[in-house]
């Protein structure tokens, strides 16, 4: 079968074909009817594919060959730090003492794992300049939300219930305003100046007695260091607010500068980015949060402590915001990050930043003659170009990204940050060689020349991939299915985008035929009996 003709797993299915022989039942058989109510039991068999083990292996091996990852090629996705993940991390994470333990074990039986967690916290405290760290948050945005909830708890404990606004720059990560909203804050945007930095005058204008915090990435998402950070911290602190550090770009200042020394009160880190946990396929991540002393009482419980008798979790924290994740963080990623930090050492981490910044500036200068450079100044770990010049010739940034696929490269981040027209954001990381950078640069230059000489080649790209382009018009208009979301309902409702926008995704149950008199068509996910009305 040709790769282009890859069948769906359901198309490979043949009735009666068996892929695995289950062993004899060696425990007492339990009937589902004795455990679940009838509403939750299928009345028909699930329509699952019937395939052999060989069918499965060939099918998913073929699909895996279509994937692109750091191990298979250059991955210059801006603001994502797609660096190589050393394989020693995987070896250590698979040690029996780490891989085979259970979070409900007695603390006395997992002292080695707890020691690793404690030491990792100490390393992160030193790296960030914070007073303590919690490893609980699962990833970056979860860390953001946790940090903002700590700030909220701090203000409320001090009687400042009117501090309901969080300020974010117009170049901020999209998760910043999203996390602020989920944490119960209103988001206020502060503008960037002509140099791509936060406009201090605009910051002074928006900061007031309602300000809970200012969220910043430093360097920012344009790859530029916020050189006025100390003055910004003073402005926010004088108004009674807190300064929050989004650690997405820590790779640019690792062992060179510390958020705590810049005036930040809260910081979250992305161990899966800066400290080489595998990412890009959905996780898992790890988003530890560090705080200054006045926020320690509100950290999620438990906190990990070291005493004369060993390591233990302290749950006696009356002012804590509660748990933010079951047990204590994504332990496997924490093991990988600890391994990386110990392998690199202080000098190695310092070199990480030096090479990341060098690689980004080298690429920026080589590409500047062929693409617009919105901010012509020294960058940090990443930089942004603009495809405005190419757009005037009828070629969009999206087309450029698609053309890169023909050469085996994962495209950079495009159309972000939002304050740069036709934005192309590139982050090479420190792990790429000059030869790799030159290969990518040469193709970017080739594409720029194609835009001028033969734009159709770029407009119609990609030409060599299995999948070409999505039908954007159809995708925008076509109806889709969404879950009912009622607690006892398994219906999948077919609904147009317009109908979904009118009702709201969390209130789809109001038009579910299983619960109302609505005439919208549905599919029942479980093939179960539909429950009665609410």
Swiss-Prot record:
Q: Which residues form the signal peptide?
A: none
Supply the InterPro entries for this chain: GcvPB, GDC-P_C, GDC-P_N, GDC_P, PyrdxlP-dep_Trfase, PyrdxlP-dep_Trfase_major, PyrdxlP-dep_Trfase_small
Give the matching SUPFAM superfamilies: PLP-dependent transferases
Under the heading CDD domains, the entry gives:
GDC-P
Q: Which cofactor does it need?
A: pyridoxal 5'-phosphate
- Into which EC class is this enzyme placed? oxidoreductase
In Gene Ontology terms, what is one molecular function of this protein? pyridoxal phosphate binding
Highest taxon of the source? Bacteria
Q: Which residues carry this modification: N6-(pyridoxal phosphate)lysine?
A: 273
User: Does Oxidoreductase show up as a keyword for this record?
Assistant: yes
Task: Give the matching Pfam families.
Answer: GcvP2_C (PF21478), GDC-P (PF02347)
What is one process in the GO biological process aspect for this record?
Answer: glycine decarboxylation via glycine cleavage system
Q: Could you list the residue ranges forming a coiled coil in this record?
A: none
Keyword terms: Oxidoreductase, Pyridoxal phosphate
Tell me the NCBIfam families matching this sequence.
PRK04366.1 (NF003346)
- How does this chain assemble? The glycine cleavage system is composed of four proteins: P, T, L and H. In this organism, the P 'protein' is a heterodimer of two subunits.
Concerning its family, UniProt says: Belongs to the GcvP family. C-terminal subunit subfamily.
**Role, per record:** The glycine cleavage system catalyzes the degradation of glycine. The P protein binds the alpha-amino group of glycine through its pyridoxal phosphate cofactor; CO(2) is released and the remaining methylamine moiety is then transferred to the lipoamide cofactor of the H protein.
How is this protein named in the record?
A: Probable glycine dehydrogenase (decarboxylating) subunit 2
């Amino acid at each position: 079968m040709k790769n282009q003709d890859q069948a769906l797993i359901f198309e490979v299915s043949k009735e009666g074909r068996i892929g695995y022989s289950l062993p004899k039942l060696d425990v007492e058989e339990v009937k589902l009817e004795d455990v679940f109510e009838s509403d939750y039991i299928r009345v028909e068999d699930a329509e699952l594919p019937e395939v052999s083990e060989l069918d499965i292996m060939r099918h998913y091996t073929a699909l895996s060959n279509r994937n692109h990852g750091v191990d298979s090629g250059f991955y210059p996705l801006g603001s994502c730090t797609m660096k190589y993940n050393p394989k020693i991390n995987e070896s250590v994470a698979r040690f029996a003492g780490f891989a085979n333990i259970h979070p409900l074990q007695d603390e006395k039986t997992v002292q080695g794992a707890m020691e690793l967690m404690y030491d990792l916290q100490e390393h992160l405290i030193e790296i960030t300049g914070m007073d303590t760290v919690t490893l609980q948050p699962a990833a970056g945005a979860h860390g953001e939300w946790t940090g903002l909830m700590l700030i909220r708890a701090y203000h409320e404990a001090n009687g400042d219930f009117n501090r309901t606004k969080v300020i974010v720059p117009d170049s901020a990560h999209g998760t910043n305003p999203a996390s602020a909203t989920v944490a119960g804050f209103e988001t206020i945007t502060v503008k960037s100046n002509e140099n791509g930095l936060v406009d201090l005058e605009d910051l002074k204008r928006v900061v007031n007695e309602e300000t809970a915090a200012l969220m910043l990435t430093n360097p920012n998402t344009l790859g530029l260091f916020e050189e006025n950070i100390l003055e910004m911290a003073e402005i926010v602190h004088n108004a009674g607010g807190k300064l929050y550090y989004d650690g997405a770009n820590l790779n640019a200042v690792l062992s060179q500068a510390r958020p705590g020394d810049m005036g930040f009160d809260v910081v979250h880190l992305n161990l899966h980015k800066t400290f080489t946990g595998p990412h890009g396929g959905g996780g898992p991540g790890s988003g530890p949060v560090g705080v200054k002393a006045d926020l320690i009482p509100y950290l999620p419980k438990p906190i990990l402590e070291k005493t004369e008798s060993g390591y233990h979790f302290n749950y006696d924290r009356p002012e804590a915001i509660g748990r933010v994740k079951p047990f204590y963080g994504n332990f496997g990623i924490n093991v990988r990050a600890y391994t990386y930090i110990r392998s690199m050492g202080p000098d190695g981490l310092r070199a990480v930043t030096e090479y990341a910044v060098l690689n980004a500036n080298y690429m920026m200068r080589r590409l500047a003659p062929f693409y617009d450079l919105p901010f012509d100044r020294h960058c940090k770990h990443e930089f942004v170009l603009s495809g405005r010049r190419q757009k005037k010739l009828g070629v969009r940034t999206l087309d450029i990204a698609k053309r890169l696929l023909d050469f085996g490269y994962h495209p950079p981040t495009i159309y972000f940050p939002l304050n740069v027209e036709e934005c192309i954001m590139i982050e090479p990381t420190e792990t790429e060689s000059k030869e790799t950078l030159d290969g990518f640069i040469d193709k970017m230059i080739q594409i720029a020349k194609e835009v001028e000489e033969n734009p159709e080649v770029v407009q119609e790209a990609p030409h060599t991939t299995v999948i070409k382009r999505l039908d954007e018009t159809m995708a925008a208009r076509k109806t889709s299915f969404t879950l009912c979301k009622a607690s006892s309902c398994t219906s999948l409702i077919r609904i147009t985008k317009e109908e979904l926008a009118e009702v709201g995704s969390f209130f789809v149950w109001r038009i579910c035929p299983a619960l109302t008199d609505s005439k919208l068509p549905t599919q029942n996910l479980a093939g179960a009996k539909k429950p009665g009305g609410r």
